[in-house]
Amino acid sequence: MKPMTDSRKIRAWHFTDGMFLRDGQPLVVGKTYTYAGWVKLCESGLHASKRPIDALQYAPGNVVSRVECGGEMLNGDDKLVCTERTVLWAYDAEKVLRHFARLCALDVIHLWDAPEIVVQYLRTGDEDMRAAARGAGAAAWDAQNKRLVRMLREGRPR
């Protein structure tokens, strides 16, 4: 796939682990980072995603940046790579991401018999309930493992 140079800028999302890029450079709002070289998805260039949910799967940390990408660019299914990426704004989104994760879990809570403490934590985000919810989740995981062991033993070839 050949990179295309486009005068059009694309707004995208990028996550970092703290206020530093993977190469150790500080993440500076307002700065345009440039890459000199061939762009190749997953290998070289400055990466970002058009949708934040796609960017999350590549996120090394909780700091989210809204970026504007330009220069030579390649578009993939869930990310892009470019030679110019300007940081428009950035902040530590841990609270937002935790809230989003709890809402996603609540969307499917009806699919299992969740312990009440887990449901309460997911609904409230109360950090005091978090350790208890984790313990209840671990107990449920252990029970599921016992069930799986039993089923695998019963279903094994004889």
Q: Which residues make up each language-model segment?
A:
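Short, glycine-biased loop/turn motifs at secondary-structure junctions and
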Residues: 1-158
